[in-house]
């Protein structure tokens, strides 16, 4: 009887130990996953914020190019001259500006390729004539479907604005360049207004079906937002120009989980967004999961061996007890 109680106590102690280790392992795995989630989200938000600053820096550099040429043009006797048009051609050739134009006070634009057009009704021209550096609303090309904006600076002569110098910049190519090496070029980028109008997009079409002019909030309205995210909060962030991140899912398909990080560009009311599958964002942490799997399998194997050893040991003890009971002590 004493031996039986001893075995029972031993089994109970082993079960308590195994349960304690199993609970600890579960807590460890949950905490590890939460840590991976936080770190991957932090990396995405940090990179999107940096790329937003990069966009402003690049456009500021090109504003600087335009200012320098506008200053030289302001020194000439005539606004539109062969010498000034040659500077426009050089500006287009030496910078990322795809088309440059010198605009007279009446709105007549003289382009570097020799074309002429009246742009007196355009906002960027009106703001330029008011002495402001201006950035136009985005326009999608009917030829290559790329989105471009016009950067404009005033041309001053003797302190008076006599015209506007403008150059077009491909913001689709810019967003592509910024995120080309981000998570091995997986996912896609969006540039939107604070109202959610999509003005530029780029990325692998396997991950999105967005078109120019779509509304950001309408596009994601039928998506499931997880981890406490809501489109109402995102709309508020867009209106305030705040940064944020949400996790989205197609219905109940966990394999479709994506992170969407966004931040203010600091130009007009633009927001830049980056969308990437969660599996890709957490890819660099796969080695942690491999170690977790190895540890879990190893722990399971050890528990199984311990259990089998206990069963064998218990059977051996029972066999010895039966033999002892059946043996005549006097023989």
What are these regions (language model features)?
Residues 322-331:
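Conserved nucleotide-binding and Mg2+-coordinating catalytic segments in signaling enzymes
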Residues 85-86, 112-140, 206-248:
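Extracytoplasmic/periplasmic sensor domains and loops in membrane signaling proteins
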Residues 80-96, 164, 168-218:
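Solvent-exposed, extracytoplasmic
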Residues 1-38, 297-301:
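Extreme N-terminal signal-anchor transmembrane helix of membrane signaling/transducer proteins, especially
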Residues 42-51, 57-136:
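Extracytoplasmic/periplasmic sensory segments of membrane signal-transduction proteins
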């Amino acid at each position: 009887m004493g031996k039986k109680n001893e075995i029972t106590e031993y089994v109970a102690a082993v079960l308590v130990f195994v349960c304690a280790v199993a609970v600890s392992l579960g807590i460890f795995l949950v905490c590890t996953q939460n840590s991976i989630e936080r770190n991957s989200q932090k990396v995405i938000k940090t990179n999107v914020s940096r790329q937003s600053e990069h966009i402003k820096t690049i456009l500021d550099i090109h504003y600087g190019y335009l200012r320098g040429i506008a200053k030289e043009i302001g020194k000439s006797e005539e606004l539109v001259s062969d010498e000034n048009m040659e500077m426009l051609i050089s500006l287009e050739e030496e910078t990322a500006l795809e088309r440059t134009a010198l605009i007279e006070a009446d709105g007549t634009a003289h382009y570097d390729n020799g074309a002429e057009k009246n742009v007196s009704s355009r906002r960027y021209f009106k703001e330029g004539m008011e002495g402001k550096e201006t950035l136009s609303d985005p326009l999608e090309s009917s030829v290559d479907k790329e989105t471009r904006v016009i950067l404009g600076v005033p041309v001053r002569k003797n302190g008076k604005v006599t015209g506007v110098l403008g150059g077009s910049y491909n913001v689709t190519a810019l967003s592509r360049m910024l995120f080309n090496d981000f998570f091995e070029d997986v996912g896609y980028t969006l540039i939107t207004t604070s109202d959610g109008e999509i003005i530029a997009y780029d990325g692998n079409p396997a991950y999105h079906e967005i078109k120019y002019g779509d509304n950001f909030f309408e596009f994601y309205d039928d998506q499931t937002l997880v981890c406490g995210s809501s489109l109402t909060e995102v709309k508020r962030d867009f209106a305030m120009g705040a940064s944020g991140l949400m996790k989205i899912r197609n219905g109940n398909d966990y394999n479709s989980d994506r992170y969407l990080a966004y931040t203010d560009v600091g130009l007009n009311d633009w927001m830049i967004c980056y969308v990437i599958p969660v599996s890709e964002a957490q890819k660099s942490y796969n080695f942690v999961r491999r170690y977790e799997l190895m540890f879990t399998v190893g722990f399971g194997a050890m528990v199984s061996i311990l259990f089998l050893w206990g069963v064998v040991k218990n059977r051996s003890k029972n066999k010895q007890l039966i033999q002892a009971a059946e043996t005549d002590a006097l023989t």
